[in-house]
From Swiss-Prot:
HAMAP family per the UniProt record, alphabetical: RsxE_RnfE (MF_00478)
NCBIfam families assigned: PRK12405.1, rnfE
Name of the protein in question: Ion-translocating oxidoreductase complex subunit E
Family the UniProt entry places it in: Belongs to the NqrDE/RnfAE family.
Lineage per the UniProt record: Bacteria, Pseudomonadati, Pseudomonadota, Gammaproteobacteria, Alteromonadales
Gene (UniProt): rnfE
Length: 232
């Protein structure tokens, strides 16, 4: 029986693809200069994850093991193309901001990894839920990283939200503080590496505190039984 609570815990925290597995670092560090870009890439990746997991789960019994990886990549590429066309049609500004990193979702190790490790061994519903949780976990890391970099670099939050949600979303832009000169370190990839390292360190500290709160289980010493044979 599938443990959906464990799947959610793995995707959102314990085995988070961004903070623990450190997968998809190239787009994660390059695109997250603003919260809007981070959410756009995160949602696109999550949609591809869910779709690819479902399709891989449905065809897993019909694809020979020898060619499963090329088939999985073709499925992922088709879904990425569909998502790319949708963003191009309905969020052209975001499409331009994401640039080459949108089609590069095809090569994201998170997606092919979940297809191989989980979707190819479980039913479609469980695979879809796993894709949703892994996608949400990745999107949350992107969002926190993007929000932190945007606040430090520009002093704003949700700048350019109209690229993702339409003209009405311009009202969502928040001016946290007035910045005369942008803080370039936070907006460039080196700053992304620093913030990412701090997020990983924070997660490790939280995990350590949670582990210390758990009651220790007493380990019973093993008893070795000696066999005595009569010596004549």
């Amino acid at each position: 029986m599938t443990n959906y609570r464990e799947i959610a815990w793995q995707g959102l925290w314990k085995n988070n693809p961004g903070l623990v597995q450190l997968l998809g670092l190239c787009p994660l560090l390059a695109v997250t200069a603003t919260l809007t870009n981070a959410l756009g890439l995160g949602v696109a990746t999550m949609l591809v994850l869910i779709g690819s997991n479902i399709l891989v789960s449905l065809v897993r019994d019909y694809v020979p093991k020898e060619i499963r990886i090329p088939v999985f990549v073709m499925i992922i590429a088709a879904l990425v193309t569909a998502v790319q066309l949708l963003i191009n049609a309905y969020a052209y500004g975001l499409y331009l901001s994401l640039g080459i990193f949108l089609p590069l979702i095809v090569t994201n190790c998170i997606i092919i990894g979940r297809a191989e490790a989980f979707a190819s061994r479980n039913n479609a519903f469980s695979a879809a839920f796993d894709g949703l949780m892994m996608g949400l976990g990745f999107t949350l890391v992107l969002a926190v990283l993007g929000a932190t970099r945007e606040i430090l670099g520009q002093g704003t939050l949700f700048d350019g939200a109209d690229q993702l949600l339409g003209p009405w979303a311009k009202a969502l832009t928040i001016q946290v503080w007035q910045v005369d000169t942008p803080f370039l370190l936070a907006m460039l990839p080196p700053g992304a590496f620093i913030v990412m390292g701090l997020l990983i360190a924070l997660k490790n500290v939280i995990d350590k505190k949670l582990k210390e709160r758990q009651p220790e289980v007493a380990v019973q010493p093993s008893v070795t039984r000696a066999r005595i044979t009569k010596v004549s």
